[in-house]
């Protein structure tokens, strides 16, 4: 029996990496009976057959798991946002941060296309990013002439997953970091202000200290796993301020003596962050119940 990490899934075949050696495996029928499927990122025990093939017997407990797309045991989630084309959006960034925290993932913010944005656009984005740095988020800016290896060297060891809407430059980033990958890229749609999906499945690529993965571009972010009462925990600044509210179950919407709203009025919590919290809270409150 060998132990390795699933690095790719295509047509029901799980490719497992064991210290640089790859095996094509399939899960035993027991998994199907239990209605449980391994995912990319899983640590598995498998039995070798025919030298480079085998059957998965056991999946180790997951530290965390992203549902869409399915990938597990992530050490850092890099949220890729472009400065322009598509334009930088704090609302979208906050939604990705909520997703990250809801799945117990450590997020990092990476701003691409630094070189094609105007000086005025970059200064405006940098002023905004300072607010995220104050909250505690690690942030980086890159452009075409950046040192991609130095950028990645700042990241955690283990599995790094790139996430972000289509067209922000995730595949371009990976191609610049590892030119041998030759991943397909597309220009963004001018009418939709977003890119066409070019990554169709999750695959882990080797890097110094671990792996790196692109994810299929998101056309919509799914918050169905989050209850409205949980949302405040996924806005880090709001969560910390909320500990001083008069009522323990304060949702910072209409409740009296709310410390969060006091800090928003004082400018200590950015108004746009609170607005995004309210918008998402209302969306979750108004969603239809699924049966």
UniProtKB/Swiss-Prot annotation:
Alphabetical list of InterPro entries matching this protein: G_CP_dom, NA-bd_OB-fold, P-loop_NTPase, Ribosome_biogen_GTPase_RsgA, RsgA_GTPase_dom, RsgA_N
Look up the domain of life of the source: Bacteria
Entry GO CC: cytoplasm
- Molecular-function GO terms, alphabetical: GTP binding; GTPase activity; metal ion binding; rRNA binding
Q: Which residues bind GTP?
A: 112-115, 164-172
Residue ranges of domain CP-type G in the record: 63-221
Compartments in which it is found:
Cytoplasm
State its cofactor: Zn(2+)
Q: What is its EC number?
A: 3.6.1.-
Give the Gene3D superfamilies listed for this entry: Nucleic acid-binding proteins, P-loop containing nucleotide triphosphate hydrolases, Probable gtpase engc, domain 3
Predominant localisation class: cytoplasm
Family note: Belongs to the TRAFAC class YlqF/YawG GTPase family. RsgA subfamily.
Instruction: Please give the NCBIfam families that the UniProt record associates with this protein.
Output: ribosome small subunit-dependent GTPase A
Instruction: Provide the assembly information.
Output: Monomer. Associates with 30S ribosomal subunit, binds 16S rRNA.
Query: What is this protein's function?
Result: One of several proteins that assist in the late maturation steps of the functional core of the 30S ribosomal subunit. Helps release RbfA from mature subunits. May play a role in the assembly of ribosomal proteins into the subunit. Circularly permuted GTPase that catalyzes slow GTP hydrolysis, GTPase activity is stimulated by the 30S ribosomal subunit.
Q: Mind telling me what this protein is named?
A: Small ribosomal subunit biogenesis GTPase RsgA
